[in-house]
Regions:
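Beta-strand-enriched, solvent-exposed domains that form extended recognition/catalytic surfaces
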Residues: 33-161
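A short C-terminal boundary segment appended to hydrolase-like catalytic domains
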Residues: 46, 443-490
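N-terminal export signals
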Residues: 2-21
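N-terminal active-site segment of His-dependent metallophosphoesterases
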Residues: 45-46, 50-62, 69-74, 79-82, ...
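C-terminal region of N-terminal signal peptides and the immediate post-cleavage residues
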Residues: 16-35
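Extended active-site neighborhood of metal-dependent phosphoesterases/phosphodiesterases
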Residues: 140-144, 152-164, 241-346, 417-425, ...
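Acidic/histidine-rich helix-loop elements
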Residues: 176-208, 265, 269-276, 288, ...
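His/acidic metal-ligating clusters that form di-metal
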Residues: 215-224, 315, 321-323, 332-422, ...
Length: 490
């Protein structure tokens, strides 16, 4: 199908930037807290700051907002300490007035947390589509504030998405960067920056994240669940088996693309790889040095999730299709698409060029992604393959959406070819903001919404990963509100 255009919800808003610096000793005064942009409140637990206000999800009829309440007087290992509070979210039409004190009570929709919590994620439903709304979040009277000056959060105004006509045809959920087997989050090299960990004895956070994604997909009535790369930490046999066990708890169908962490690994890097099948790279896939070394690669991931560098097609109940692409290389984090796979992908797309199609691959493909991600262009799909891939999309008007993970961030990128397809990078399931992207299919388009992981374990982990990267995780991962919430007309 041809697309008539893209409608976005909300304006430009960076994720809430934390100013926390790890390594600072525990504080004895509020002035040393990194959460400086906040309101001070008090309850039976003591003084707290209501901070980190962030608009998470905007749909045609709902608004989801999150914030946290931190101890106003102390830090632990340079990070703020959560304080349980009662939370409240109030939402009202902007047309009723911007000052809540003068708004008619009947115009205000109000929801409360179910109990005390340090992390608050509240949703107001029953809103009108394509309408400006004001909102106010507070914990026991302390008004939650964004940590830095964000657009929607500072203005406290959002616009709901337009409503697509007709009945909902199908919902699918797409997650990425789960990293089953990983034990520390937020590091670049070694233990730097200081990582987030779960407390001793707690369930591993990648498993908490994937279980929450699966539960969220089940609650949404999703027919299918997709993991777009980096399902595992390093594709060790026990990681692959555990990931498969968790995915099999989803009541519908699931499919997985391969990410750089899921690539075949060298047997000499870890004795555990020895139990897995030998992987023979195709001709020309290895450098001369690698060939001379006679490297022994093992593909534990492929034994459960399919052959490397081959595309797959998943037929949707709504009449569309999802096409998965393997963009991994050997021995590096960058991306490539082998010529045989590129040819096969071209055949798939050309076979039904106007059929509504979502394409997913782990590595981002646009020049904008290449030159804005912290890992430099070497971190994404190589430029030659990226242009070949985009030209295939350009020749296939039915491609409505191209989804990538890998960068652990939310971003809507401009393509480098003349296409109306939307190119998205989607946030990681295991690190802030922790969740998955829900796609709802209608006759005339797709509703795209990021949904935060739910549950006490998931929220506890969200607070921990929120303060990785020296508190910059929201700026690096959340992206803009309209990169996570949009309507694609197709």
């Amino acid at each position: 199908m041809l697309r008539a255009g893209l409608i976005i919800g909300g304006g430009i808003a960076l994720g809430g930037i934390g100013a926390g610096v790890a390594g600072r000793p525990a504080a004895a005064a509020g002035s040393t807290s990194p959460v400086s942009t906040s309101s001070i409140g008090h309850n039976h637990h003591g003084r707290f700051r209501a901070a980190d206000l962030q608009v998470m999800t905007v749909t045609e009829d709902s608004l989801t907002v999150c914030w946290a309440t931190w101890d106003a007087l102390r830090l632990e290992e340079g990070r703020p300490v959560g304080v349980p509070t009662n939370g409240r979210l109030r939402v009202w039409p902007k047309s009723a007035g911007s000052d809540l004190r003068t708004v008619r009570p009947e115009a205000v929709r109000e929801v409360h947390s179910l109990g005390e919590a340090a992390f608050h994620l509240l949703t107001v439903e029953g809103l009108e589509p394509d309408t400006d709304y004001c909102f106010e979040a507070d914990s026991e009277g302390a008004r939650a504030k964004p940590t830095h000056h964000l657009i929607e959060e500072s203005r406290r105004v959002v616009r709901t998405l337009p409503r697509l006509p007709g009945e909902l045809l199908e919902t699918i959920v797409v997650a990425n960067d789960v990293h089953i087997g990983e034990t520390v989050d937020g590091v670049l090299v070694g233990e730097f920056p200081p990582p987030a960990r779960v407390p001793e004895g707690a369930r591993p956070y990648p498993e908490v994240a994937l279980a929450a994604v699966i539960e969220g997909a089940r609650r949404a009535g999703a027919s299918r669940l997709f993991v777009n790369g980096d399902l595992t930490s390093e594709a060790r046999p026990e990681e692959v088996r555990r990931a498969r066990e968790l995915l099999d708890t989803f009541p519908g169908r699931w499919r997985v693309t391969r990410g750089n962490h899921d690539r075949p690994h060298r047997a000499d890097q870890d004795a555990r790889y020895a139990e897995c099948s030998t992987y023979t790279p195709p001709e020309g896939a290895l450098s001369s040095a690698a060939r001379d070394e006679g490297r022994d690669y093992r593909d534990c991931f492929g034994e459960h999730f399919g052959e490397r560098q081959r595309p797959w097609v998943e037929e949707l109940d709504s009449g569309g299709r999802v096409v998965g692409v393997d963009s991994t290389t050997l021995d590096s984090s960058g991306g490539a698409i082998a010529s045989d796979q590129m040819d096969e992908l071209g055949d798939i797309l050309r076979s039904e060029p106007t059929r509504r199609t979502v394409v997913m691959l782990h590595h981002p493909v646009t020049n904008e992604a290449a030159f804005t991600n912290p890992g430099t262009p070497a971190f994404v799909l190589n430029r030659r393959d990226a242009m070949k891939f985009q030209r295939l999309v350009e020749q296939t008007p039915g491609v409505a959406l191209v989804m990538a993970g890998h960068t652990h961030r939310s971003r809507h990128n401009r393509p480098d070819v003349a296409t109306e397809a939307v190119f998205l990078e989607t946030p990681a399931a295991k690190s802030w903001p922790t969740g998955a992207t829900h796609l709802r299919f209608f006759d005339d388009g797709i509703m795209v919404n990021f949904r935060h992981n739910m549950g006490a374990e998931a929220h506890d982990w969200a607070m921990r990963t929120r303060w990785t990267q020296f508190g910059l995780s929201p700026a690096l991962g959340s992206g803009t509100v309209d990169s996570r919430n949009m309507v694609i007309r197709c």
